[in-house]
A protein has these predicted regions:
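HIT superfamily nucleotide-processing domains
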Residues: 1-140
Length: 140
């Protein structure tokens, strides 16, 4: 498996070099809205630890990501009046991974509404700001 690349986009977000629509941060994780969402409220949860994917993250760091993902999922159910949640994680290119920093996709779902194709459109910043505010309010 290739080594972790500290110049990946999510590492740059963690260092403040790239902006994001942050909804949650703690000592071990960061959660922010996907700028190319597959549904309303599509959130990414990442570890602050350098981890390429699920194959190389420590069990302790993965536990932090799992806890934060659950917290986001519960808040997203409320914030977006969802009827379910899809959580996805892709590892390595053959597994569908595009950004090589571990990330969990947390997507609020509604009956009969299909997910958009991956990376099919970039969401408007004002929409992302409004959705971030809803999720932040539900996290309180």
């Amino acid at each position: 498996m290739p080594a972790y690349d500290p110049n990946n986009p999510f590492a740059k977000i963690l260092r403040g070099e790239f902006p994001c629509y942050k909804v949650h941060e703690d000592d071990h994780t960061l959660a922010f809205l996907d700028i190319m969402p597959r549904c309303v409220g599509h959130t990414l949860v990442i570890p602050k630890a350098p981890a390429r994917n699920i194959l190389d993250i420590t069990p302790e760091d993965f536990a932090h990501v799992a806890r934060a993902s659950q917290k986001i999922a519960r808040a997203a159910m409320t914030a977006f009046d969802a009827q379910g949640i899809t959580v996805q994680q892709f590892s390595e290119a053959a597994g569908g991974q595009v950004v090589f920093h571990l990330h969990m996709h947390v997507m609020p779902r509604h009956d009969g509404v299909a997910l958009l194709p991956p990376a099919s459109r970039k969401e408007d910043g004002k929409v992302l700001e409004a959705n971030a505010a809803k999720l932040i309010a539900a996290l309180k």
